[in-house]
């Protein structure tokens, strides 16, 4: 394990690991325990009571964060003709078809999200092994395979995020920056949590949301009460 910095260790001492924090208290503490001078990213990890090995227990979805992520996503679009023009007008960072695929095959991956029109998916399939493991493969379930490319670009740049359970039944997503006030962080968290709860598989048994941790990308994890799904802006009782 990498040696922790003095700043990290000092921040970790502020976290009481014997308690479960309210989302509001956790957001406040995450801001306090960011250990860099740069604007740290605030992240959430959720452990779910599902078995990702079963196809009917795969949890995935999208959510438009009401306050965005604090970062403007770099979006590419696989499209041609009129749809390519629409994507460019909407602010896509790169638009193309065969040329864009060749660029990615050459090692270029300087983007955060990829969108494709349905007619381009057969071609995009050639780079599925590059995009898939990075969570960048366009998919109809996340709204990234669509004919309405302008809306898809606008949504992603406006703060739309994707979530997908990993092999260990964990979800990871961003809810903003340490510079956000805690209420905005909590409202973003609540929007994501609502979508995760809606995505609960009918075959999942027992407790669905088992563990929640909030942290900055530079600070210690803060345990959050997984049962707090309503009145998230309330303080601890």
UniProtKB/Swiss-Prot annotation:
GO biological process: regulation of translation; translation
GO cellular component, one term: large ribosomal subunit
Molecular function terms, GO-annotated: rRNA binding; structural constituent of ribosome; tRNA binding
Transmembrane segments: none
Keywords: Repressor, Ribonucleoprotein, Ribosomal protein, RNA-binding, rRNA-binding, Translation regulation, tRNA-binding
Xref: Gene3D superfamilies: 3.30.190.20, 3.40.50.790
HAMAP family listed in its UniProt record: Ribosomal_uL1_B (MF_01318_B)
Assembly and interaction partners: Part of the 50S ribosomal subunit.
Record family assignment: Belongs to the universal ribosomal protein uL1 family.
Main function: Binds directly to 23S rRNA. The L1 stalk is quite mobile in the ribosome, and is involved in E site tRNA release. Protein L1 is also a translational repressor protein, it controls the translation of the L11 operon by binding to its mRNA.
Protein name: Large ribosomal subunit protein uL1
Originating species: Nocardia farcinica (strain IFM 10152)
Gene that produces this protein: rplA
């Amino acid at each position: 394990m990498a040696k922790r910095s003095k700043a990290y260790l000092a921040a970790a001492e502020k976290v009481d690991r014997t308690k479960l924090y309210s989302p509001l208290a956790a957001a406040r503490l995450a801001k306090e325990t960011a250990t860099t001078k740069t604007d740290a990213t605030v992240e959430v990890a959720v452990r779910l009571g599902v078995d990702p090995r079963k196809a009917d227990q795969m949890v995935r979805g999208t959510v438009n964060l009401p306050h965005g992520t604090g970062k403007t996503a770099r979006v590419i679009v696989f499209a041609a003709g009129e749809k390519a023009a629409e994507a460019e007008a909407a602010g896509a960072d790169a638009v193309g078809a065969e040329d864009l695929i060749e660029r990615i095959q050459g090692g270029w991956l300087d983007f955060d999200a990829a969108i494709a029109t349905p007619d381009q998916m057969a071609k995009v399939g050639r780079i599925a092994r590059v995009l898939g493991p990075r969570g960048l493969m366009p998919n109809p379930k996340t709204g990234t395979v669509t004919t309405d490319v302008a809306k898809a670009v606008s949504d992603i740049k406006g703060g739309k995020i994707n979530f997908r359970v990993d092999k260990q039944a964990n979800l990871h997503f961003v809810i903003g920056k340490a510079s956000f006030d805690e209420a905005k962080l909590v409202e973003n968290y609540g929007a994501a949590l609502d979508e995760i709860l809606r995505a609960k598989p009918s075959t999942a048994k027992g407790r669905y949301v088992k563990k929640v941790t909030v942290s900055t990308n530079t600070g210690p994890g803060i345990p959050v009460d997984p049962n707090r799904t309503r009145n998230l802006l309330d303080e601890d009782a």
